[in-house]
Amino acid sequence: MIPDVSQALAWLEKHPQALKGIQRGLERETLRVNADGTLATTGHPEALGSALTHKWITTDFAEALLEFITPVDGDIEHMLTFMRDLHRYTARNMGDERMWPLSMPCYIAEGQDIELAQYGTSNTGRFKTLYREGLKNRYGALMQTISGVHYNFSLPMAFWQAKCGDISGADAKEKISAGYFRVIRNYYRFGWVIPYLFGASPAICSSFLQGKPTSLPFEKTECGMYYLPYATSLRLSDLGYTNKSQSNLGITFNDLYEYVAGLKQAIKTPSEEYAKIGIDKDGKRLQINSNVLQIENELYAPIRPKRVTRSGESPSDALLRGGIEYIEVRSLDINPFSPIGVDEQQVRFLDLFMVWCALADAPEMSSSELACTRVNWNRVILEGRKPGLTLGIGCETAQFPLPQVGKDLFRDLKRVAQTLDSINGGEAYQKVCDELVACFDNPDLTFSARILRSMIDTGIGGTGKAFAEAYRNLLREEPLEILREEDFVAEREASERRQQEMEAADTEPFAVWLEKHA
């Protein structure tokens, strides 16, 4: 089932320096909660400055949904320590609140109680909140409070030059973009390994269903927790953050221009379903527009091609201008065993897997095959640890045992690990391979199995509150290592100044401005 990567691995072993200079970054979302686990109703903590313009700490859907962002970094330890500093400072500046350590929320009874993220009075800030109003009216606020970790990854130019020859200008844009689309296609085919290993949402609180019927064969505990005994990541299931209306958009990952055309089409395609919501009600705007996507960011995807945007530039226009610059991996649940929601083992695994995806052959993928890859993902998401579970290749009928496929993949990853260790020194990547490959013979070692044992004992609420309390105490006591207190104060002041400048620079009323941007 795994493509034959032996030639590509032999090439890599002859060109180890091609992997020197991998760049990465992390984004981590987490809900602010009270000591009893209920959602905080306070505004964004003052010490964190402006959520609109702060470089490192912002908000996602809700005012209580924090998002931490590291700068691009070539050093894993430095990146994780930077992320930990963001958590340390925040833990000291959020009063008695703490950070919810799980992907799935628990103590939220009614979606309407969730305050949307607020970004001030600038047109840009009001637009961001209106986008979230549209998300709430389309999918419900509760679904939008699900948290995850995003891992951003780019290969060094040395890799592309070693692989594609001496490239520059338009040639580099085309070839590097084609290389990243290869990564994306392989990710769709084999990325289910991420929820298998690191999925940490095998259960939900009964309040999350809000009384809606479900076809999933949940087991229920006395405290009202619903779980699937072999599930890995209900966050990635249809219960979680998915958009069924997007499944027939036909967006593919074979070619830059084809992908961008599909994305641009989606933000222009009217939706009958969303038209029923309306645009305005009693003078209040309900969504940006009633198209399938309000804006490009609404496209649900487990992985995205990205380029840093310039001011006023859409993500797709940035891709057209310069091609793909990096990849955003979006399938990581919050790691409940880490105070910062992610750990070194995961980052090193993702490095290995991304390199493997760049090396392995990846035939073009039609939208129908893309849909077929979802079958494997769904199996792993809902019953990944089930004995005897098999997976297929694309739309073909042949089936292969998941543990065997996993071990075959790790045989390749071990060779990538040896190459990365040879240029970085030590055996850190090989150690990660040895630790994780054991999960295929013993699924009890996976994150989902480990957290489910705790949840069955104490419920999701009990588990979440215990971790949240422990991490709050730990982070509040730890000294900062990279950033200093004055760095945070300076960024708070600078972010507030940037927001004020944006608000002062606006000359058009929001309604007029919106007509140009909707």
UniProtKB/Swiss-Prot annotation:
Membrane-spanning ranges: none
Protein name (Swiss-Prot/TrEMBL): Glutamate--cysteine ligase
Keyword flag Thylakoid:
no
Coiled-coil stretches noted in the UniProt entry, renumbered to this chain: none
Look up the EC number in the record and give it.
6.3.2.2
Provide the top EC class: ligase
Gene Ontology molecular functions: ATP binding; glutamate-cysteine ligase activity; metal ion binding
The entry's family comment says:
Belongs to the glutamate--cysteine ligase type 1 family. Type 1 subfamily.
Q: Which organism is it from?
A: Escherichia coli O157:H7
Keywords assigned: ATP-binding, Glutathione biosynthesis, Ligase, Nucleotide-binding
Q: Identify the pathway.
A: Sulfur metabolism; glutathione biosynthesis; glutathione from L-cysteine and L-glutamate: step 1/2
> Which InterPro entries does this one have?
Gln_synth/guanido_kin_cat_dom, Glu_cys_ligase, Glut_cys_ligase
Q: Which GO terms describe its biological process?
A: glutathione biosynthetic process
Reaction catalysis annotation = L-cysteine + L-glutamate + ATP = gamma-L-glutamyl-L-cysteine + ADP + phosphate + H(+)
Highest taxon, organism lineage: Bacteria
Per UniProt, what is one Pfam family of this protein?
Answer: Glu_cys_ligase
Per its UniProt record, what Gene3D superfamilies does this chain match? 3.30.590.20
The UniProt entry's GO CC annotations, sorted and at most eight, read: cytosol
